[in-house]
Amino acid sequence: MIALVMFLIDQGTKYLIASRLEMYEQIPVIGNFFLITSSRNRGAAFGILQDQLWFFIVVTIAVVAGIVWYLRKMTKEGRKLLPTALALVLGGALGNFIDRLLMGEVVDFLQFNFGSYTFPIFNIADSCIVIGVGLIILDTILDGRREKLNKLNTSREVSGTEGNE
């Protein structure tokens, strides 16, 4: 459900930008700090791998298939954070995938300026992917701590049992 909602928000915002703004047209939202800027990207984050459409299509299909398979597995385990993270990545990956498949490029529009530095323009799908990956890292850290606590508790139980015999 999260993946679908984020996909729809991503596609809806991209449609609004592409249909109502000329290329590179800007709308200041918060002064010069945050602007809506109509842009297109034929590559990945920060403009890398420009014009590698088939590479992105193949990689995205593999990633989406892996996430869907893993999400089905995760629902049986009752975990919450990792499935949410994967759903965000899935929604974002599908949003950019559809753009690439239908237009050969991705619609970007969120621009942030920090003084004289302009952060690369991005979109909702990119945000979902970055937040999802961040949550995957957080889940990995938390899961590692849970495993250490479980091992510690198990070793205490074993040593406590042996001492009572």
Regions found by a protein language model. Name each.
Residues M1-E165:
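Alpha-helical transmembrane bundles and membrane-interface segments of multipass inner-membrane proteins
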